Amino acid sequence: MTTSDVAHRAVLFCKQDCKPCTLTKEFVFAIKPRLTEYLSIVQKENHPALVAAYDLELYPTLLVVDEYGHELQKIVGGKNVREQLVNILNTIRYNRNT
């Protein structure tokens, strides 16, 4: 997986044995399928090159990525991610449809 694979999306980065990551993924699955077509979930251990490309150290981290794979916004921490995720996905959906 490369930065172009996650272009124009929100990308949730998680890692194993991370309780906030688990809670955040459960939240994501609860809103499926309404907005998750605009979201990719990436497991840190499975995609080290992508994690390195975005210089990630804390999890969960939600990135909003433009059509070129460039980071537009970074939100760190499960509670912060859950509070802002639906609004971010709605914004991406709106921008794709205009």
Task: Give the positions of each predicted feature.
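Short beta->alpha connector loops
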Residues: 43-46, 60, 79
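Local sequence-structure signature of Cys/Sec-based thiol-disulfide redox active-site neighborhoods
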Residues: 1-33
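Non-catalytic, surface beta->alpha helical segment in thiol-disulfide oxidoreductase systems
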Residues: 65-98
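Secondary-structure boundary motif
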Residues: 30-37, 94
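Structural micro-motif
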Residues: 54-64
